């Protein structure tokens, strides 16, 4: 059995962060990065979700082997819980362990998806999140394009004291990544929110790159397939990678859907499809 391990779990603030109820599944002892990784590791072993929170939140996994670029087929897949009307896209990044030290400290390459290169897609987008001054408060943020806003505190659903990760000691932190144009809309008659999908290339997205077997009703078992050949440099040119050793998934939208809260990518598993 080939093994995968989580190397980093740094979500943005969100409704599932620090949550100790059954849904969030935290213990309240996740007060260090190491404890957060241990918790996320157990979650994936239990086939439960890890939320990446709002825009820029990420998880990094490594493997005990390199995943080769197999050509035309999908090389690996990531499980989310998307279904029609409920997509929360995560951007995928890959890395080779060039220096051979077993750590994800080399260069990240984005895997292009359907939105890569579009005018409304922003690379190197930054959002700085600020620790709330008190309990049960919204989390304020400022983005690199000059906007400001907040991650809503949802008192009716997620009642933990803070949505700001307990294992981040700083009073603010900045997350960087590629930001897609949001596709969430509210029906003015029913009040229901619709998080529409993107064509292909994203985790937790009801796209045309899904692996068969997931539920279209509640998103359970929903997986998206990814090709190493889609790795690109920052300028959009092909990276031509022959293999990868690390995968990062980063929440790719800065948006919220009313009572549903922030749009936040969820991951359940990572699987090498070349074996």
Tell what function each PLM region has.
Residues 98-107, 209:
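Acidic, glycine-anchored loop motifs typical of Ca2+
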